[in-house]
Amino acid sequence: MEHLETIGMNDSFDRPNWDEYFMLQAELARLRSNCLTRQVGAVIVRDHRQLATGYNGTPPGVKNCFEGGCKRCELRMEGKVEAGASLDRCLCNHAEANAIMHCAILGIEAGVKGAILYSTFVPCLECTKMAITIGIKKFVCLDTYPETDYDLLNEAGVE
């Protein structure tokens, strides 16, 4: 077994706060993404306990983007589809959707009420609606998405 001396921390011991800790978990999940155009990781947390993790990519059993599974991502990489266009043709599940589905698969949907969603990217409208529906009460995100509906989050009481 190999022992890791550091994980990107500086020489002085800087213990991450909870938001930093769980965002690091989302960043780690992002590394599993098989999407050609954007890698996103997400973690659902309640009471400082990680409930589920997700990253964007094709569904199980479907060729991933690196293998040519998603034609939309392939066309995007070739410059034939603009960013944000033809998303309905993308085969990749979003990281947030995968984390939400994993909660359902694992039968922990009741434990999600009041949870926090950590994501390396602000969720799209569809993922935002799913998160609100299952009871997510706070989003912590690193990057923004132009179509994010902040009014919807405010109306639903999501921080």
Feature locations, PLM:
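Zinc-dependent deaminase catalytic domain
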Residues: 1-159
